[in-house]
A protein has these predicted regions:
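Catalytic cores of the polymerase beta-like nucleotidyltransferase superfamily
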Residues: 4-348
Length: 348
């Protein structure tokens, strides 16, 4: 999600604080000054005397780690129906984006806020979870994947951190909540999520138990839909530390087994520091083309296997069409290069 200018201003006010010991608390406290956030919190708190709402997951992790935050996720101890009623009472627009899984998306001044009811897993099959709504915060935290993603905060910046995720984040450790193999079997997409978070946050070596659990259950990744798989890889590819992948033999081996079509991962390690830090600003399809274009029919197979949209398919095939031409000085002219950048920029 690319924030609107208004969202950028909001996030700048909220999250870019001075570097001091009160960083976390001051970052969260500033949110109260924002109209949109304040409206949502007031709507939930006024619904009943026992209703609670907290920030959760990525936005809390990023605030603690002093990162740019591009979305805000919220957790509540109300049922989805009660969340809808609470928003209706305050005339806040919303849509039921994932109500079966407990998620309501509030919309204020074109800013989206995902509000999810506390849950516990009743059944899992490696792809989807059957959930039951709860009012127990630790129960909700225990179903999350990693300790660094199970940190909650109220509007004042007071943390609820039952699995010491803040400590792991500060120490550069990426730990599953509970047994790694059990958590992977609940949702095999966690294999890719582990790699993304490890490359971005780890300051240590892999826990051998985690790597063994991943390799033991790697075949389960094939049960994940191509859409979910590619969406998660997109987050990995556009993350700030993707270039580290080629230097991490465990992660590289796993990615090569999941995506054998990626032929040129090592090329990213050769980019300069400026380029590596700006991955997230580069269009996904353009980055993807670097991985899959190799002068064979690899691109066609990748498009078929991952069911790319017509727009993405067109762009990838366009970039592929220039692969052989770039080695022929007679046909590959400056205008061809300009066309590539124009086409890529226009469609990005």
């Amino acid at each position: 999600l690319v924030p609107q200018p208004h969202m950028n201003n909001l996030l700048n006010k909220i999250f870019f604080r001075s570097q001091n010991l009160n960083y976390i608390n001051s970052g969260f406290k500033d949110i109260k000054k924002n109209t949109e956030v304040d409206q949502i919190f007031r709507a939930i708190h006024s619904f009943s005397k026992n209703s609670e709402i907290r920030y959760v997951g990525g936005c809390v992790r990023k605030i603690i780690n002093r990162e740019i935050v591009d979305d805000i996720d919220l957790a509540v101890n109300l049922s989805p129906k009660d969340v809808c009623d609470a928003l209706n009472n305050k005339n806040i627009k919303y849509y039921e984006s994932g109500i079966d899984h407990g998620t309501i998306t509030a919309l204020l001044n074109d800013i989206k806020f995902e509000i999810t009811s506390l849950r516990k897993d009743i059944d899992t099959d490696g792809r989807h979870a059957k959930v039951e709504f709860s009012n127990n915060w630790k129960e909700d935290a225990s179903r999350r994947d990693f300790t660094i993603n199970s940190i909650y905060s109220d509007i004042e910046g007071n943390l609820f951190d039952p699995f010491e995720g803040k400590k792991d984040l500060e120490n550069g450790k990426v730990n599953f909540i509970g047994d790694a193999e059990v958590r992977i079997k609940e949702d095999y997409l966690r294999v890719l999520r582990y790699i993304r978070f490890f490359l971005n946050y780890s300051k240590d070596k892999h826990d051998p138990k985690i790597i063994n659990a991943i390799k033991k259950n790697l075949s389960g990744v094939s049960t994940i839909s191509s859409e979910r798989l590619l969406d998660e890889f997109k987050k990995l590819l556009q993350s700030k530390n993707f270039s580290k992948l080629s230097k991490d033999q465990d992660c590289l081996e796993i990615i090569n087994l999941i995506f054998p079509q990626f032929k040129n991962i090592s090329i990213f390690s050769k980019l300069n520091n400026f380029a590596q830090k700006n991955f997230s600003k580069v269009d996904f399809i353009f980055l993807l083309s670097v991985l899959v274009i190799d002068g064979t029919d690899n691109v066609d197979y990748f498009i078929y296997k991952f069911n790319l949209s017509k727009k993405d398919k067109k762009r990838l095939l366009f970039l592929n069409s220039f692969y052989s031409a770039k080695f022929t000085s007679k046909t590959f002219l400056e205008k061809n290069l300009n066309q590539i950048f124009y086409f890529n920029g226009k469609e990005a």
